[in-house]
């Protein structure tokens, strides 16, 4: 796995530290930065994180703070290639649907298996990106093959129509032999 940049954004410092410790053990070559506000995350987007694990309810300390959905919307505008995994204490289907409609890669409910699900989602993000890179490489290769085929056909047509003396049967038809 290449060096990943992961942002953990949660206003619960203990939750952040536990998740960071878990991910550090589970993911090789990952740089994990912890932020306690959505605003701090948005200010760091120029660092181009691969994955952002974002708490849905970020306004528990400051009522004026952006919530997770607002931060997600800003991330989609400013750094659309970052994959966002929304972490929430809410187990409500309508919230999960809204989050996914707004472009989250996954929605994980805070529970005893949440850290395992976050790890699994991060691995899925990386597998998806690897497949996209492989698909792009395959498309480029197919483009080269098609271009080569077109060049060969063009060469054959040029030879056939413009240089008849190279082809023995055409030489005979043209009375060159």
Spans of features found by a protein language model:
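Conserved acidic carboxylate
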Residues: 10
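Receiver (REC) domain switch/output surface
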Residues: 117-129
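Alpha4 helix (beta4-alpha4-beta5 surface) of REC/receiver domains from two-component response regulators
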Residues: 66, 70, 91-108
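Short amphipathic alpha-helix used as the core "switch/output" element in two-component signaling
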Residues: 57, 61-81, 98
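Acidic, metal-coordinating helix/loop segments flanking the phosphotransfer/catalytic sites
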Residues: 34-51, 56-59
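C-terminal output/effector regions of signal-responsive regulators
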Residues: 136-177
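Two-component/phosphorelay signaling modules centered on CheY-like receiver
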Residues: 13-33
């Amino acid at each position: 796995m290449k060096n990943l940049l992961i942002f953990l954004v949660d206003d619960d410092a203990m939750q952040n530290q536990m998740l960071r410790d878990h991910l550090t053990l589970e993911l090789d070559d990952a740089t994990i930065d912890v932020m306690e506000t959505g605003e701090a995350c948005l200010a760091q987007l120029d660092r181009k994180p691969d994955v952002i694990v974002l708490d849905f309810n970020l306004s528990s300390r400051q009522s004026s703070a952006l919530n997770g959905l607002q931060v997600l919307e800003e991330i989609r505008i400013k750094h659309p290639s970052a994959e966002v995994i929304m972490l929430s204490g809410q187990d409500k289907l309508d919230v999960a649907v809204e989050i996914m409609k707004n472009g989250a890669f996954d929605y994980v409910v805070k529970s005893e298996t949440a850290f395992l699900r976050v790890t699994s989602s991060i691995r899925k993000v990386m597998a998806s990106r690897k497949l996209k890179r492989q698909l792009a490489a395959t498309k480029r290769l197919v483009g080269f093959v098609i271009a080569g085929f077109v060049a060969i056909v063009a060469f054959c047509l040029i030879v056939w129509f413009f240089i008849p003396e190279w082809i023995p049967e055409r030489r005979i038809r043209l009375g060159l032999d």
